[in-house]
Curated annotation (Swiss-Prot):
This is tRNA-specific 2-thiouridylase MnmA. Its EC number is 2.8.1.13. Residues 156-158, 312-313 are annotated as: Interaction with tRNA. InterPro entries: MnmA-like (IPR004506), MnmA-like_C (IPR046885), MnmA-like_central (IPR046884), MnmA-like_central_sf (IPR023382), Rossmann-like_a/b/a_fold (IPR014729). It is an enzyme of class 2 (transferase). Pfam families: tRNA_Me_trans, tRNA_Me_trans_C, tRNA_Me_trans_M. One of its GO terms (cellular component) is cytoplasm.
Amino acid sequence: MDVIGRKKVLVAMSGGVDSSVTAALLLEQGYEVVGVTMQIWDPKIEVIGEEYVGCCSIYAVNDARRVADRLGIPYYVLNFRELFERKVIDYFTEEYLRGRTPNPCIACNRYIKFDALLKKALSLGMDYMATGHYARVVYKDDIGKYGLFRGVDRKKDQTYVLYNLTQDMLRRLLLPLGEYTKEQVRELARKYNLVTADKPESQEICFVPDNDYRKFLKERRGEEIKPGNFVDVNGRVLGQHQGYPYYTIGQRKGLGLALGKPYYVVDIRPETNEVVIGEASEIFSPGLIASDLNFLWFDEIPERFEAQAQIRYNAKPQPAVVERIGKDKVKVVFNEPQRAITPGQAVVFYRGDELLGGGTIEKRL
């Protein structure tokens, strides 16, 4: 029987153990829970075979539905294909054509999960939306705003891909897994007798099931990708590449060169169709320029502040000085040079466990 005043929450269910336990925990806490999975697949991708069970595949939908049945909650599949194609897949391919390395998870969180899906939840009369991310939303009494903090499981922390959240999003967001470790989550799934309890994690890009992004780019934009030259930092031709979108900063393997010593991708030049390669020392940089910024609770970006800056998902944050150099642009100078700063990736700023905000890396210094 429904309890008067019960808060309603829409749980984004990917078919994995994390979102399954999120739904179970919130139900146990007394929320009225509705489960949804976002249908984001191109029909051509859906028929790739039963071996793929990653996030939001048709097999993941089946797992999410079984969990919802087990918990006794309503469950729906919502069609976000067109929006996902436009905001995530088109962005993904276009960034590579610009000589940059995209982060599709950040784009998905920004435009799909925490924008379109949250708006859908509110339109359906939900009070909150919840996901299985490992992070913690905390109300900061001293400033009257919400902050985002790392999850207690530092190995699983996902705040890096959540820096685009706004105050309006944070006040409607529940992240119950921020207080648990991954092993504790699996133990809870076994306790609740969920079919996803021992399901392995998906490591690939969700819309590139075999994780071969080069093949994906070739199928989508192959007519625009042409061979060109590998050059050193002085412009000397060292060989031929297969197309600059197939490479990323810091890459060593797969260059197809025999030069007697290791070479790494140092820069990508779309305008001349060149991939610059160099020795290990040449992929280190003192800092970067970032734009397209979002800070979770700053009214205005300070002219200058110190923070721990993280330049890729699994990187360790490094001490840096951040200087505002425009309305939507900052310069970040690290205490020590950093390896393989990559345009297109995110730089995210922390103070201790608190996420301050972040932006997109435009170039290295």
